[in-house]
Amino acid sequence: MNKDHEEQLEINEVSQKNKYKSIIESLLFMSGEPINIKDLATILNCKQDKVSSLLNEMNNSYVGKDRGIKILIHNRAVQLVTKPENSIYVEKLLKTNVRQSLSQAALETLSIIAYKQPITRVAIDEIRGVKSDRAIYTLLEKNIIKECGRLDVPGKPILYGTTEEFLKFFGLDSIEAIPNLEDLLKEFSKEEN
């Protein structure tokens, strides 16, 4: 094999590695959630060891640079995360955007959970008159509500309640600081008259 051919193979290998890194970065960015290394290997049609090696190279390229992200690997699952030193800025963004980013259905569902917790999805659906699966999923993803047990009836449905993040987002010291529902209803009925 001549030297030119070896150099061409090396260039092709570097190009292929960079393509894989680009794809991995896109997948991690779009997912927002941890992705198993095995799943990345399947998507890329390569071995898990190669994916692990690429991830280490990628993370090394983020370390020490003025980059705002890094790769977190835990239990063979990978996630693109912000660097801890930027957390105060990320928190500010999340606090200002959480109310704007919740749909009407999510806000209704959150209100029901806040006032009736712990409560099942079926009970929420009955109060709203429509299914609440998507709204509950969104609220769980945003860590505003959590699963807080199971109701002791056949089927053992999940009970939902609010989180510390809920209190932070709405500037409340405790769940007891939520305005009294009856007082709110009286106030709204006065405004309508």
Swiss-Prot record:
Major localization listed first in the record, in broad terms: cytoplasm
SUPFAM superfamilies: Winged helix' DNA-binding domain
A Pfam family this chain is assigned to: SMC_ScpB
Keyword field: Cell cycle, Cell division, Chromosome partition, Cytoplasm
Keyword 4Fe-4S: no
InterPro entries on file: ScpB_csome_segregation, WH-like_DNA-bd_sf, WH_DNA-bd_sf
Subcellular compartments: Cytoplasm
GO cellular component: cytoplasm
Gene Ontology biological-process annotations: cell division; chromosome separation; DNA replication
Subunit text: Homodimer. Homodimerization may be required to stabilize the binding of ScpA to the Smc head domains. Component of a cohesin-like complex composed of ScpA, ScpB and the Smc homodimer, in which ScpA and ScpB bind to the head domain of Smc. The presence of the three proteins is required for the association of the complex with DNA.
Family note: Belongs to the ScpB family.
Entry function: Participates in chromosomal partition during cell division. May act via the formation of a condensin-like complex containing Smc and ScpA that pull DNA away from mid-cell into both cell halves.
HAMAP family (alphabetical): ScpB (MF_01804)
Name the record gives this protein: Segregation and condensation protein B
UniProt organism field: Clostridium botulinum (strain Hall / ATCC 3502 / NCTC 13319 / Type A)
Gene assigned in the entry: scpB
